[in-house]
């Protein structure tokens, strides 16, 4: 028995339950509720964030030695050492250079400029000086003081070794009479015996050692003269 087309559609629709019209996703959503739904419906309560302006304006050129001093202060917060105090004092009391103007009235010739170094505490005590080519200092007083200093240097050997003078007398152990008598004795005999040396020393008011040394020196002098004559 053959069934026509409209009838077959009717029977197929009657067999399939009316629930089939719904989508599978709707079925599963009805059986298992989505736990994220209430979470999405509730508003999220987060504390409000407020950012304060904690960053200060940074200067492009930091002060000199500032990082080194800050590092020292961080390392030694309790009791700063003597080196740190000296460094800070040196930085605080640094000298400042004050320059004079280089330009003057028209027609004046500028001479050498002098600069004064003034510290922050005693800047008022320092006076500025400028000298021009037309001004000449008085040299009379300076010449007198220079002569006096030269005399003091000459009198004081320790002041200047160029002007040092020995306070010892010139070495002259033998008088003219003693030298003449010793020369006579040397002509008679180049070598003295002990007794003769004792006698000569007694006659000339000398010691035996002085007589002995004189004869030794005289013999060396004669040998040198003979050697020079033989070379000539």
Curated annotation (Swiss-Prot):
CDD domains associated with the record: homeodomain
UniProt GO molecular function: DNA-binding transcription factor activity; DNA-binding transcription factor activity, RNA polymerase II-specific; RNA polymerase II cis-regulatory region sequence-specific DNA binding
One GO process term, biological-process aspect: DNA-templated transcription
Superkingdom per UniProt: Eukaryota
UniProt DNA-binding region: 167-226
Induction info: By derriere.
One Pfam family cited in the UniProt record for this chain: Hox9_act
Primary localization class, coarse: nucleus
GO cellular component assignments: nucleus
UniProt cross-references to InterPro entries, sorted A to Z: Abd-B_homeobox_TF, HD, HD_metazoa, Homeobox_CS, Homeodomain-like_sf, Hox9_activation_N, HXA9/HXB9/HXC9
Gene3D superfamilies, alphabetized: Homeodomain-like (1.10.10.60)
SMART domains: HOX (SM00389)
Compartments it resides in: Nucleus
Alphabetical list of PROSITE patterns matching this protein: HOMEOBOX_1, HOMEOBOX_2
Stretches the record annotates as Disordered: 22-43, 116-167
Keywords of the record: Developmental protein, DNA-binding, Homeobox, Nucleus, Transcription, Transcription regulation
Family: Belongs to the Abd-B homeobox family.
Purpose of the protein: Sequence-specific transcription factor which is part of a developmental regulatory system that provides cells with specific positional identities on the anterior-posterior axis.
Name assigned to this protein: Homeobox protein Hox-B9
Organism name: Xenopus laevis (African clawed frog)
């Amino acid at each position: 028995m053959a069934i026509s087309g409209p009838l077959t559609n009717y029977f197929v629709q009657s067999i399939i339950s009316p629930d089939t019209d719904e989508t599978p996703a709707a079925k599963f959503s009805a059986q298992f509720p989505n736990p994220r739904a209430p979470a999405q419906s509730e508003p999220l309560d987060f504390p409000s964030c407020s950012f304060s302006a904690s960053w200060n304006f940074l200067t492009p050129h930091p002060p000199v030695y500032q990082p080194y001093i800050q590092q020292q202060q961080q390392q030694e917060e309790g009791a700063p050492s003597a080196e740190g105090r000296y460094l800070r004092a040196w930085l605080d009391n640094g000298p400042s250079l004050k320059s004079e103007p280089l330009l003057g009235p028209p027609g004046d010739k500028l001479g050498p400029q002098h600069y004064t170094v003034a510290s922050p505490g005693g800047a008022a005590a320092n006076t500025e000086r400028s000298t021009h080519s037309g001004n000449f200092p008085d040299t009379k007083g300076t010449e007198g003081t220079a002569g006096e200093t030269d005399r003091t240097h000459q009198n004081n050997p320790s002041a200047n070794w160029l002007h040092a003078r020995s306070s010892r007398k010139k070495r002259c152990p033998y008088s003219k009479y003693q030298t003449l008598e010793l020369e006579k004795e040397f002509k008679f005999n180049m070598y003295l015996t002990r007794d003769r040396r004792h006698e000569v020393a007694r006659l000339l008011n000398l010691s035996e050692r002085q007589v002995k040394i004189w004869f030794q020196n005289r013999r060396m002098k004669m040998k040198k003269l003979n050697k020079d004559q033989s070379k000539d």
